[in-house]
C-alpha cells in the first residue's frame, strides 16, 4: 500500500510540471496595459521601445515602465482612433541624398489630408516631414535597414485596388517604387541580406490571401510564402518582423493587442510579449521571419535559404486583436529567480503520450512491489 501511495505521489509531481502552456505550445503574455495600443517599434538607443496608442506615443523600458512621450507643447497628438503606424530611426546614412536620419527620431503615418509622415524628434517635438501624393490612405511603414533602398523610409498605401510603395529620403523627398503592388497592409519589415533570394527586399503581409510578399527596389513583387494562417479582413496575417542576431539566446518578442469593440477578437489594449526560448523549442532561429495574424495572434516562422519553409510557432488563436509590427528584441533574458518556472512547451500529443507511459510504468512498479 505504501508503494502504491508513493507511485501516485510521483505521478502527481510529474503532472504538476506539465502546465496548460506545455500542452498548447507557446502562448502570449499580457504584459502591459496601454490605452488604444496598436503598434510597437524600436528599441531606441536607450533600450526603450516606442509604442503608439490612440493618437499618443509612449516609451516602455524592459522592466515594463510606461511613460508618455512627445506629450508636451509642440509634441505629437494626432489621428486618435486611427492606425497611424510608426517607425523609429536607427540613424542610417542615405548616400543618394547626402544626409542622415537622426538616431531615435520617430516617424508616424499621417492619416488625414495631406497624407504623409510626421517626424517626432528624440526630444519630443513634432513637425510634418513628408507628403505622399497619389494614395487613398497609408497603411504601412518601415526603415530600410539593409541598404538596397538606400536606407530610406518606406511607406505603403492603397491606390485603386492596388498598393503603392513609396521611398522617402532624409530630406523628406519621395520616390514611388511601384503603384501596382498587390493588396497589403500592416507591420512591414525589410529582410536582412541573409534571407535567401529575398534579402534586402521589403516584406509585407496580405490578410485577405494569407500571402507574404517581397517588393524589390525596382518594384518587382514576388511571393515569399503562403502563410497557411487564417485569412480575411481583421483576421489574416497582419504583421511581420525579423529575428535579429542573438535573439534566440536571450530575447523577447512584442506585439500590440488593440481593444476592438464588437469584433470576434475584441483584444485587450495590451502589449503582448513572449520569451525567445519558448519559440526556439518550436524551431525558431535567428534570421527567421515571423508573421502573425490580426485575429487571434497565431504565428509562423519563415526561413529562406535556397528555398523557403514555414514553421508554426503559435497555433492556438486567442481573443487578441493584433496590430502593427512584430518586434523581436535581442539581449532581453528570460524571467530570472523568483519568476514562474518556464514550461516545457511540448506538443500536446507528446505530453499525453508521456503521461500515459509514466502512468503505466508507475502502475507496473506498484503491482510488482505488492507481489513481493
Indicate residue ranges for each PLM-predicted region.
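Sequence/structural signature of beta-propeller domains
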Residues: 23-343
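Bacterial N-terminal signal peptides that target proteins for export
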Residues: 1-7
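C-terminal membrane-anchoring or membrane-association module
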Residues: 357-372
